[in-house]
């Protein structure tokens, strides 16, 4: 019409409800955005979560009370481009496609065991006389360690096999045998005496723990806070 578009009677009757609905949707999206601004969604592996991060979350919360840390614990690499994931911490070479990876630590590793098991290990060759716990998920190499420290390759290493790294740690703590572990992951249990490093012969591997972020993702306040906190906390552990 000359005066412009005229809504049909049915639409005119529904306008108040539609307006209220759109207003509610806008308010909900604004509320969601505000929540996202202070929630840091972090995906990690089980051993990193249970052996290192869980004992230090309180420190992060105290340093950054405005940030709520939400953990997604997964054995596989989560798609970091998802809107509900801000970043992750993963163990490997740091060459995953589609992400930027920053090494935070965990490159040195060596055998650990409970003190009673360590009493049976007077020399490297004694590893043939105790169970060697096998972690199917680990990238840490017994062969590389053997070569580095000069352990006879003919010595067979046998023991229980676990498909979960955290359970393998529990097995070592419960005196089931010797486990190859990253120094960063065994630091707390060594500090409190539940585990010891019987040979004190660490080696440096090509793998480590990386902070990973989807390529192209902006540097948010919460991500920057985590990065800075890790830079201080990891060397101290």
PLM region descriptions:
Residues 37-97:
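Central regulatory/effector-binding core of bacterial HTH transcription factors
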Residues 200-237:
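A late-sequence structural motif
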Residues 82, 94-206, 233-237:
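C-terminal regulatory
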Residues 5-34:
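Alpha-helical "hinge/linker" immediately C-terminal to small N-terminal DNA-binding modules
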Residues 41-43, 88, 112, 133, ...:
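Short, well-ordered beta-strand segments
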Residues 34-40, 126-128:
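Immediate post-signal peptide segment of exported/extracytoplasmic ligand-binding proteins
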Residues 1-9, 198-199:
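Beta-hairpin "wing" of winged helix-turn-helix
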């Amino acid at each position: 019409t000359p005066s412009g578009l005229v809504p049909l009677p049915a639409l005119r009757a529904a306008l108040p409800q539609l307006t209220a609905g759109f207003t509610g949707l806008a308010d909900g999206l604004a509320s969601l955005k505000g929540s996202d601004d202070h929630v840091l969604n972090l995906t990690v592996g089980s051993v990193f979560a249970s052996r290192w991060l869980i004992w230090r979350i309180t420190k992060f919360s105290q340093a950054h009370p405005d940030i709520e840390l939400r953990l997604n614990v997964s054995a596989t690499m989560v798609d970091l481009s998802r809107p509900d994931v801000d970043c992750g911490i993963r163990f490997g070479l740091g060459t995953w496609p589609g992400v930027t990876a920053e090494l935070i630590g965990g490159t040195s590793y060596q055998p650990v065991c409970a003190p009673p098991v360590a009493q049976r290990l007077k020399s490297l060759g004694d590893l043939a006389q105790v169970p060697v716990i096998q972690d199917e998920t680990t990238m840490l190499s017994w062969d590389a360690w053997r070569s580095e420290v000069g352990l006879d390759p003919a010595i067979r290493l046998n023991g229980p096999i676990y498909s979960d790294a955290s359970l393998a740690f529990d097995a070592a703590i419960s005196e089931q045998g010797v486990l190859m572990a990253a120094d960063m992951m065994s630091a707390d249990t060594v500090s409190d005496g539940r585990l010891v490093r019987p040979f004190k012969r660490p080696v440096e591997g090509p793998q480590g723990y990386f902070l990973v972020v989807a390529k192209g993702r902006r540097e948010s306040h919460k991500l920057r806070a985590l990065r800075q906190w890790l830079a201080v906390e990891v060397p101290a552990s």
